Amino acid sequence: MTGAAACLAGFEGITVVIHGSSGCYYYPATLLHAPLHGTFILENEVIFGSGDRLREVIGDLSNKGNRIAVVTTCVPSVLGEDIKSLFGENDVIIVDSPGFVGEMETGYHKALSALSPVTDPGRLGINIDGVSLSDPFYEGNIQEISRILRNAMIPIGTIFCRDTSENIGHASPLTVGTNEDFKSGVGEYIGGTLGIPALRETCKKLAARYTYANMDPVFNEIDKQEERIIHACDKFLRRYDPPGVAIFAGAAYALFAADSLKRYLDAQILIVGTRNDPPVLPNMDYRVEKLTGLEEVRDTITALEPDLVIGSSFERSLSSGRAFLGIIPPLRGQFRLAYPPLVGVGGTLHFIENVLNACIDKRA
């Protein structure tokens, strides 16, 4: 449900209604910081049906000029209410996305499918996908990849999912990604931008596809900034041993963190615990498995005794004073005003910088 709301609320011109209880509304509302609406159904509506309440809420919103999207939660789904029949031919987007259908990524993709994106062969530029309002780095990721593309003189197409609703219907034929857990499936996928190696390969493909692009400044920046990363990590390793690291995140961010720390810091990757199903990759250098329960995570941290834990506030609460770095929600107990990226050149710089400082702070 939260993933579906994150997808839909990312598009200007779509009004999102969470059809469920107050609890179903408040979690995405506080996580996404987006203008969501709720039906706040009560006990009698669970028994006698919630259609009247939904019609009332949508009636109040229908004169605002936006398309309305309804995300159904567990109670309406379990009751089997026929939500679509309530609106007939009206242009209401219905996304059945109760919590039991899967992870956040499942709801996101269900909502994106309901929007029916269309590519426009005549549109120049390239789409940016993998953007979710649930991601604490989404704003910085957009800014970083937009900056790189503009430096290469490549126009930007549709941003999935942080754009206007009109742009859903005429996306560019080509796409680059920021977070493959939220891959859009729109157009031809050129490659990802998580980590320096992936960014470099994607830029090579962009240079081949966009003959008018000026990629030299981009490649020069990649090489220069990677040297800075190598120098900083070498300086750290002259004073400290490589850290043992336990990583808990979505598969894309978790594997980025593991690959970057192994490449630049020679870190011992003790575990890569993913919240969603990890991709099947050959020749993995470390243990990768899906871990979705706090008890599993607690037992893993206790058994492996890592120097550094990477994850969310949940993992921080289990880290017992170890060095910690947050890369996935929720990230509680801190102010977040700036828009740091995790993708592109700036994302790797930001990530490695924070890892080094977290480790030094705990060893000082």
Describe each PLM feature range.
Residues 1-364:
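An N-terminal assembly and electron-transfer interface module characteristic of large anaerobic redox
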